[in-house]
C-alpha cells in the first residue's frame, strides 16, 4: 500500500511523435517527468483519462506505473448509478472537477488538455491540488459504500493487466482483412436487402424505436422491458427477431472491419474495464468482441506462437445455482450440460438446446409463468411439461423474491464484493427493476469471477492475453504450453469463489 499520492497531468501528443508532456503534482510541487521516471514512482498515481496516455507510457518503457487510480473510473465504478456509465462517453473531467476548483481554472485546464491553449503551470498546480482533493473524497465515498476493496483488489490490477496486454498489440493478417473488407459490404447489403424485403421495411438498419413501432401493434408488450430483451427472449410467429439479430451481428462486424486500415499490421485496442454497470470488459477502437466468428481469422498469433480459446460452460446457470442454493438447479449443473437437460425436460429432445437455453434464461430473469409457457409452446413444447419442469425450482423462486426484497429495502443490490446498482425511483419495484436486480447480482458476479481468473492468469508464465470476452478469453502461448492449464485456472477460480458449493466448468473451444 502506498502512503503518498501524486497527480499525473499529461498533454497527449496525438501525432505520436514522442512529444507527450508528463507532469507530477505532489508535496506542493509540479515536476516535469519522463515516462521512465513515472513508472519508477513509488507513490499512488492519480489521473483521469488514463486510457489515453497508458499505451504511450507502455510503448516507451514496456511497463506501467505500479499503482494508478483513474478518478473518473473510480467515480463511475463505485457510484452504482447506471446513467453515470451511460453518459461517460459524452462528458469529460470538467464536471467532476467543478466542486474542487474554480470554474475558470477548470475551463482553462480543459483547453490545455485538449491542446487549445498553451501550458500554464499555475493552472496545472491548481488542477493538481483539486484532483488530490477529489481523489480523497472519492476514496472515502468508495469505502463508505463498500466499493474500495473491489476497486483496489480487482478493478485496478485487472485494468493494469489489460492495458499492458492491449498496448502490446495483436497481429493482423492483412490478406485476410482485405478479403473480408471486400466481401463485407456485399454481405451486409444483401442481408439488409433481404431483411427489408421480407418485412417491408426501409433499406436501413432499424432503430429501437422502429422496432417498437413495428412490434407493439402486433401485440408485443414493451412495458418494463427493453428491445434487446424482446428480441432475445420473446418467441415470435416469424423469424423477425432472429433475422434482425443476425443483421445486427453483420453490421457490428462490418464496423470493426472498417475501423482497421489495411496498412495496419498490428492493432492496439482501447480497454474499457468497466464497460457496463455489471463491470463487463470491452475492447474498443476496434471493438474486437463484435467480430463475427468467420471474421476472427484476421487476428493471428505472433511468430512462433499459437492461439487458444477458453470459455466457461453454462456460466450464468452455474452462478445462479450457487447463489440461490437451489438443489434442483445445483444437480442439473453438476450432472452435465444443464441446457441439454432442460431441452430434454421440456421438448423431450436434447437437440433443442438452443431454444431450451433461451427459455431457461427468460425464466431465470423473470419472465411471467404464463408468458414462459406460451413461449415454450411457440417453440413446439408441451405446455404441461414446461409448467411441471419450471415448478421444480422452488428454492430459486424464493431466492429471486429475496433479491427483489433486498433491492427494495436497501435501494441497491451488489455482489459479494461491491459493484452495486442503485435504484432510480422509490416505492414497489417495477418488473424491469426486478429483472435488473437479479441481473446485477448474477452478471456482476460473473464479471467478478472472470476478473479474478484474469488476475490468476497473469501469474501463468508464457501466457499472453489477447482478447477477453464476457466469459471467455483468447490468449497466445508457445507450442509446448498446455492450454488446458488455463481452463483449469478458470474452472478452479469459480469453484473457489463459491467455496466448493459448485465445481466450475471451463474448457478449450474453437475461437473461429
Q: What feature does the model see in each segment?
A:
Residues 1-18, 126-289, 306, 449, ...:
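Conserved "right-hand" nucleotidyltransferase catalytic core of DNA-directed polymerases
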Residues 5-6, 18-142:
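Conserved DEDDh/DEDDy metal-dependent 3′-5′ exonuclease domain
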Residues 43-53, 311, 467, 472-477:
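Short glycine-rich phosphate-binding loop at a beta-alpha junction
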Residues 51-62, 72-84, 214-216, 313-328, ...:
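Short active-site loop/helix that positions an aromatic residue
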Residues 75, 91-97, 273-350:
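Function-dense linear segments that define catalytic or interfacial modules
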Residues 113-119, 137-145, 149, 167, ...:
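Long, amphipathic alpha-helical stalk/connector segments used for oligomerization, subunit docking
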Residues 185-204, 393-396, 480-512:
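Polymerase palm active-site segment centered on the conserved acidic dipeptide of motif C
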Residues 344-465, 506-510:
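Conserved catalytic core of nucleic-acid polymerases
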